């Protein structure tokens, strides 16, 4: 006996968007039938004197084509007085005051005579009769549109061919005392359907492997692989692959290394350095893409909260070494990421580093809550002594750079995030008071940038929600374990990294997406379209199976 849960669809229904049949429908049945046991048991409660007393019930949903193969079983709890029972399929709208198989688009296998009924009141000899204790299975193959039955685990052969789409499992009873239980995969099946599924999976995969391709397919695939390596900045691998396949790399190696450097900065959470490096290597890129710059800046704010952005990490380092912290020093932080001028403009206080207490954290929350409330208003007036034309006075190109224009050697600020050992959890901005103050100043600058974008380019719901979600992190004493804490997950950096990488490639007239990824996406979309069109073979064609 096979025992996978929800067996009829669990292994082949990966493309199905529609729910599969899981029980009988209390709203799609004849009144002569009663349901119980989670709508899986059906009992007859009519008079049962003539064929006009027959009654059927359909499942809650039709069988989705995307499942490929669907199987269910019905156990005869009691054959009742005469055992006039039918098990089969029907489309929506078929008369339920009849046994399955008697009407058009209705198909059934009957227990009293063992005949199969295909849209007709006249049956054809098919299999043995069935009675109390027997288990009858019905398998619908949506690849070749056939149906076969099983009895007590043994196949009885094909019963119906050329089946229409959107069929519902159906059972019908006609005489008093008849009771049956359905199994739509909630329990182990008597018949080993897995072997049948494996057989058809092998057939479909063999068809795919035998599909003819053009003679240049190998060189085409090599070019796609090469472009994929170049796109993601795998410089050494791309160079080695190009040599081994006698190709030329589409992009200069220096350019690939530059993109790789920027990607590493983004994926490590060092957003300030990533923005600075991008502006140095591609001076006009972010100026021409203000929404991209805004996205990068919002991510930088999130990394400040996380304590991973270079700016706050450097402040944390310096404040541990100096009682005045970075804010009071005359020097800038590494790579010019934080400038003394910006501090003088926005942050006038000097604070020693300390773990944040509850009072301080509440103050931060109130400050940023005020920022959120201001942002929600359409008539926000920024403080003129802090901003010029809606932006920080430290900016040079209309948008805040978050960095100095100098280019000193990169100074690594790789200290681990501070942990509040008294509470056993992470601290805002690594626990540095100076870093928290800089984060608040940066948040104000970010809000100013948002207002400027809205004035110049109109409302942007994506930008507004992005900023609101980022600011919402400060509404919680432990943002990592808050409803918006997902933003602090390193995996959230990947989308930002991809957007920036695509923009850089675009200025080099290279594809924003690698052809290999587009081909895989096209294959996935084709499979989904096959499922929508009722082509059952799509159930056995997974793109992932060919990526190993």
From Swiss-Prot:
Residues 217-249 form the LisH domain. It is a peripheral membrane protein. The keyword Membrane applies. PROSITE patterns: B302_SPRY (PS50188), CTLH (PS50897), LISH (PS50896). It comes from the Eukaryota. Residues 1-23 are annotated as: Disordered. One of its GO terms (cellular component) is cytoplasm. Keywords: Cell membrane, Cytoplasm, Membrane, Nucleus. It holds the Pfam family LisH. GO terms for biological process: cytoskeleton organization. SUPFAM superfamilies: Concanavalin A-like lectins/glucanases. Residues 2-189 form the B30.2/SPRY domain. It is found in: Cytoplasm; Cell membrane; Nucleus. Residues 255-312 form the CTLH domain. Its main location: cytoplasm. InterPro entries: B30.2/SPRY, B30.2/SPRY_sf, ConA-like_dom_sf, CRA_dom, CTLH/CRA, CTLH_C, LisH, SPRY_dom. Identified in the CTLH complex that contains at least MAEA, RMND5A (or alternatively its paralog RMND5B), GID8, WDR26, and RANBP9 and/or RANBP10. May act as scaffolding protein, and as adapter protein to couple membrane receptors to intracellular signaling pathways. Acts as a mediator of cell spreading and actin cytoskeleton rearrangement. Core component of the CTLH E3 ubiquitin-protein ligase complex that mediates ubiquitination and subsequent proteasomal degradation of target proteins. Belongs to the RANBP9/10 family. This is Ran-binding protein 9. It comes from Xenopus laevis.
């Amino acid at each position: 006996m096979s025992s996978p849960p929800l067996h009829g669809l669990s292994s082949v229904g990966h493309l199905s968007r529609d729910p599969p049949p899981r029980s009988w429908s209390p709203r799609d049945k004849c009144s002569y039938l009663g349901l119980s046991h989670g709508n899986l048991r059906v009992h007859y409660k009519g008079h049962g004197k003539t064929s006009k007393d027959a009654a059927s019930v359909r499942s809650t949903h039709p069988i989705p084509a995307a499942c490929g193969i669907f199987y269910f079983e019905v156990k005869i709890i009691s054959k009742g007085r005469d055992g006039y029972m039918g098990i089969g399929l029907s489309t929506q709208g078929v008369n339920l005051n009849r046994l399955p198989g008697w009407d058009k688009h209705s198909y059934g296998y009957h227990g009293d005579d063992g005949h199969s009924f295909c849209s007709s009141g006249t049956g054809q000899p098919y299999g043995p009769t069935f009675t109390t204790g027997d288990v009858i299975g019905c398998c619908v193959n949506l690849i070749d549109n056939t149906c076969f039955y099983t009895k007590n685990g043994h196949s009885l052969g094909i019963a119906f061919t050329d089946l229409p789409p959107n069929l519902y499992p159906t059972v019908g009873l006609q005489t008093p005392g008849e009771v049956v239980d359905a199994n739509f995969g909630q329990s182990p099946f008597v018949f080993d359907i897995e072997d049948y599924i494996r057989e058809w999976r092998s057939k479909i995969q063999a068809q795919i492997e035998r599909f003819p391709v053009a003679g240049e397919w190998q060189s085409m695939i090599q070019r796609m692989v090469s472009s994929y390596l170049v796109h993601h900045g795998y410089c050494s691998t791309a160079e080695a692959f190009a040599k081994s396949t006698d190709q030329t790399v589409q992009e200069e190696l220096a350019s690939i290394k530059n993109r790789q450097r920027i990607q590493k900065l983004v994926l490590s959470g060092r957003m300030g350095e990533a923005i600075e490096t991008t502006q140095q290597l591609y001076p006009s890129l972010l100026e021409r893409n203000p929404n991209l710059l805004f996205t990068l800046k919002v991510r930088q704010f999130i990394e400040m909260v996380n304590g991973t952005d270079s700016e706050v990490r450097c402040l944390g380092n310096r404040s541990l070494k100096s009682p005045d912290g970075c804010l009071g020093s005359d020097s800038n932080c590494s790579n010019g990421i934080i400038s003394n001028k910006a501090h003088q403009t926005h942050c006038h206080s000097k604070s020693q580093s300390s773990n944040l207490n509850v009072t301080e954290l509440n103050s931060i929350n109130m400050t940023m809550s005020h920022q959120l409330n201001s942002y929600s208003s359409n008539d926000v007036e920024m403080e003129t002594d802090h901003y010029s034309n809606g932006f920080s006075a430290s900016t040079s190109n209309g948008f805040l750079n978050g960095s100095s224009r100098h280019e000193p050697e990169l100074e690594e600020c790789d200290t681990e995030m501070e942990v509040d050992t008294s509470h056993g959890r992470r601290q805002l901005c690594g626990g540095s008071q100076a870093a928290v103050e800089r984060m608040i100043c940066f948040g104000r600058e970010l809000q100013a940038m948002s207002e400027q974008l809205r004035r110049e380019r109109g409302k942007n719901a994506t930008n507004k929600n992005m900023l609101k979600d980022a600011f919402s992190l400060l509404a919680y004493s432990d943002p990592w374990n808050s409803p918006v804490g997902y933003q602090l997950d390193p995996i959230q950096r990947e989308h930002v990294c991809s957007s920036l990488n695509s923009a850089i490639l675009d200025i080099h007239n290279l594809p924003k997406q690698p052809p290999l990824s587009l081909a895989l996406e096209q294959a996935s979309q084709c499979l989904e379209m096959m499922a929508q069109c009722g082509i059952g073979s799509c159930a056995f064609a997974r793109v992932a199976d060919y990526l190993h």
